[in-house]
Amino acid sequence: MKLTRAQFLKALPAAALVLAGCAAAPTAPADTDELVFDHAYPLDYATQFTADCYADGSTLLTIPDAQAKFLVRPEGAATLRTVPDGVTVLQQPVQNIYLVSTSAMDLFLHLDALDSIALSGTRAEGWYLDEAKQAMQSGRIAYAGKYSAPDYERILTAECGLAVENTMIYHTPEVKEQLERFGIPVLVERSSYESSPLARMEWIKLYGILLGKEALAEEVFTQQAQRIAPLLEQ
């Protein structure tokens, strides 16, 4: 059974899930599986994902139409003893990413996070972004096969921490299932389904949460919004 967002909050193994102040002070990781909901991460335009923040620094990313939930845990956080069904835990730092969704690369570049990507689903000559092309030509990022025919051996050897796919993966569901059987979480990117340029750009906040770069993501988004908004009003 897949949990709704509300059901997930109720299912967390906490004595009580209560709203705490948004400015709760960070605390050292405790040896506990309790998660206390703190606040919903504010999104101005995006509707294809939500983010719920917890007092220990964890964030639950939900992509409803992909039926996916990712609980991003801070580096050094205690291992949870109980995780609700349908939730994938991602422990920071999220590294050695297999990036298949080409549209996400620009957001990674804005976050100065090219070094978090180890594998690409696009060959060097297929990239329209010079930084990505150069990273592949220099060997910093390796080609690991397209979405429908990944090089599983290379992906496993690279100790891939996350595969970022686009919705084309649904044409070959067996590939997604195989990656997950190998223990590789698969995030299906849906920014292209947003209704406006600003909503698509706001996906930078999702990647900021994944990579521990929330402040930079907010800064970049604000700058881009200020630049784009006047053009949209014309």
Per-region residue spans from a language model:
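N-terminal export leaders
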Residues: 5-9
